[in-house]
A protein has these predicted regions:
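Short, conserved loop/helix-junction motifs that constitute active-site signature segments
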Residues: 77-80, 105-106
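Flexible "cap/lid" loop of the alpha/beta hydrolase fold
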Residues: 1-16
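Alpha-helical elements of Rossmann-like donor-binding domains used by nucleotide-donor carbohydrate transfer enzymes
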Residues: 30, 62-66, 100-101, 128-135
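Conserved alpha/beta-hydrolase catalytic His-Asp/Glu region
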Residues: 18-78
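Short beta-strand/loop motif that positions the catalytic acidic residue
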Residues: 79, 85-87, 91
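Conserved alpha/beta-hydrolase "acid-adjacent" motif
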Residues: 92-98
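Short, glycine/charged-enriched secondary-structure capping and boundary segments
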Residues: 1-4, 45, 82, 98-102, ...
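Catalytic active-site module of serine/aspartate enzymes centered on a nucleophile-bearing elbow/loop
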Residues: 107-141
Length: 141
């Protein structure tokens, strides 16, 4: 509830001044803390390119709306290929319990949960994520 209120109040201002927000650690924590467990561990340029910059890309709003409108959970059982699910234990956007549910519903899935990681494990723990992805893809060849 507090996060929703904060984003209603501060979100437009953060968006308007996003490059400055990213450069200042206390503002970066305030703006991205709800999504990324430790946003100050990420390089500012990477945070801009992969997170904030993506939010202003054409199509981002449409993609987010589609995600909200369409519940994919009932279709997870239709996935026939090996699937790697990577989740941050400290994800504040979609709780880790959802990952457990998705894993149970998805045949041939493998679930990896990263401790001390939030909503974007590929950015928060890139070395571990990339090694895991390399290993998963090599095993599936």
């Amino acid at each position: 509830m507090a996060t929703a209120f904060a984003w209603k109040v501060f979100g437009p201002i953060f968006a308007e001044h996003s490059k400055e927000v990213i450069r200042r650690p206390h503002l970066r924590q305030l703006a991205f803390g709800p999504f990324i467990r430790y946003p100050n561990r990420l390089r500012a340029d990477l945070l801009w390119e992969q997170v904030a910059g993506g939010a202003v890309c054409p199509g981002f709003g449409d993609a987010l709306r589609a995600t909200i409108r369409h519940d994919i959970r009932e279709r997870l059982g239709d996935i026939e290929i090996p699937t790697l699910i990577v989740w941050g234990f400290s994800d504040r956007v979609i709780p880790v319990q959802a990952a457990l549910s998705y894993h149970r519903r998805t045949p041939r899935s493998r679930l990896e949960i990263f401790e001390r990681t939030g909503h974007v494990p590929q950015l928060e723990r890139p070395a571990r994520f990339n090694a895991l992805l390399d290993e998963f893809l090599a095993a599936e060849r």
